[in-house]
């Protein structure tokens, strides 16, 4: 028996839920896009019709993030993991080290990849505050004087940790914003490179965004594959080879949807409201636990455990039956995790809290 999609809320950490209006538009246009009699995924990436999609997508993203003119916007392949390699290979130049701020799993993953190309200087920013997980303030981060750049991940999806400040440094700041881009306002001009896998707040998996300051182009090592070379991608308008056109088109629809919601400033207010509803209930409960200090709690990913972990399987089964999908926590930390990206409506978070309350009453 098929489930009524009106009552389904997808809390997947990624690939994550897409806005329903975007999915509906893609469905309507799937077989006959713009009256061409074909799908958008069947036309040449060099056709005037698709180039218009690409150009509009870039402009909409520039508008949403207020990206300065001296930054290139690149639509890349390989996801954020490809950027783990692309960043050092593009930015090191003659340097032999870069500072990596370690606040969690994804920052550590970037370090492991960087070790193939340099000797990363790792500053562990993990901390404990009032018995909870936290991150040291950026003012306390130690940056190597010879670092080519400073890399960090502002939002760690597994632990549900978010970093809200930046160091004061003359080094280019590189941020893996895969799980936080477009969720809150940022000042792009403070960064050298911002990159993000698409499958959280941008679109479907298969594409990534890199926003690169112009002065950082042209530093690439000779061994860098052309497909990862920021300068090559910029010169070729992100079409050095055939791009993932359908993912690009869908990302463009997401950008238009976000503009229609009032842009990043408006969606940030919604995101803060959603997160507050969930965190407030967890904090008021004696049955559920979140182990992150309020100063560093993620707006996008809310992990929680129960005081009776033996009930995890029952919780997940009953939640699934009610249309509350993909709440299982990452295998590294266990428990549950609610990912509440831009596409998650407030109604979904309220439905989750209602279920959590009922489950607590029945099982406490």
UniProtKB/Swiss-Prot annotation:
Metabolic or biological pathway: Amino-acid biosynthesis; L-serine biosynthesis; L-serine from 3-phospho-D-glycerate: step 2/3; Cofactor biosynthesis; pyridoxine 5'-phosphate biosynthesis; pyridoxine 5'-phosphate from D-erythrose 4-phosphate: step 3/5
CDD domains tied to this protein: PSAT_like (cd00611)
Compartments where found: Cytoplasm
Primary enzyme class: transferase
Binding locations of L-glutamate: 46
Domain of life: Bacteria
Entry's Gene Ontology BP terms: L-serine biosynthetic process; pyridoxine biosynthetic process
GO cellular component, one term: cytoplasm
Modified residues (N6-(pyridoxal phosphate)lysine): 200
Chief place of localization: cytoplasm
Functional note: Catalyzes the reversible conversion of 3-phosphohydroxypyruvate to phosphoserine and of 3-hydroxy-2-oxo-4-phosphonooxybutanoate to phosphohydroxythreonine.
Protein name from the UniProt record: Phosphoserine aminotransferase
Lineage: Bacteria, Pseudomonadati, Pseudomonadota, Gammaproteobacteria, Vibrionales
